[in-house]
Amino acid sequence: MHLGHEEFQRTDGRASTGPADAGPAGAGRAPRIGVGGPVGSGKTALVAALCRALSSSLRIGVVTNDIYTTEDADFLRRAGVLDPERIRAVETGCCPHTAIRDDITANLDMVEDLEADTGPLDLVLVESGGDNLTATFSYGLIDRQIFVVDVAGGDKVPRKGGPGVTGSDLLVINKTDLAPLVGADLDVMARDATAARGARPVVFTSLTADPTAADVTAWVRAQLAELSPRGGSYDASDASNASQPLNRM
């Protein structure tokens, strides 16, 4: 089932605050950032890092996606990165990209229920289940999207492209500490990522070396300064690196 961006119908009687409120100044809802990428690239670890870095100043909620389990949500709860009530899980029962792009009903309902149950939030992170390089989010569900790949797949990954690599708002190349172990050339990855994305930003990171994901956190703060429906109350003073096309960790 494919849903367009004009009409979304809930089945539980609650009013949808989705696409009609999408984009900057969406009335009555928090900005939403999607985090996608292949299995094992570090999506959940990045979500955890963002929660740790931002939760002292922002009210954050998280919705995870897995095909048959709640594994990623369970991990985040055990890690204590947020109040457990602010972490919700969608079991898609299908290919991950279907639930974030083709039929976003389950995710949209979960995000809306999260906000209705916990009160006003400043940011909702929606983590996709692990998928391939073609996975992208519908902008009826999110306002910005981060795509995470890692060096363990080899330095050819940015060159292979795909909508996630070329079209995401931020490309994160993760696990740079593993590059010497797998023979990945970070300079090649930087060159190919820049060629594929043009001016769209790319961040290299290692959550082992930098558990706060400082460059990604700065980029998120910069997006919130743009997207905030609450009058631009976010401090983007630490986001100076976010405008740079390439940051190496």
Swiss-Prot record:
Where composition is biased (Polar residues), the residues are 238-249
Q: Which Pfam families match?
A: cobW (PF02492)
Report the protein's function: Facilitates the functional incorporation of the urease nickel metallocenter. This process requires GTP hydrolysis, probably effectuated by UreG.
Q: Which organism was this protein described from? A: Frankia casuarinae (strain DSM 45818 / CECT 9043 / HFP020203 / CcI3)
- Identify its protein family: Belongs to the SIMIBI class G3E GTPase family. UreG subfamily.
Protein name according to UniProt = Urease accessory protein UreG
Under the GO molecular function aspect, what terms does this record hold?
A: GTP binding; GTPase activity; nickel cation binding
Q: Which GO terms describe its biological process?
A: urea catabolic process
| Positions of region (Disordered) | 1-34, 229-249
Swiss-Prot/TrEMBL keywords: Chaperone, Cytoplasm, GTP-binding, Nickel insertion, Nucleotide-binding
Location (main, coarse): cytoplasm
Entries under SUPFAM superfamilies matching the protein: P-loop containing nucleoside triphosphate hydrolases (SSF52540)
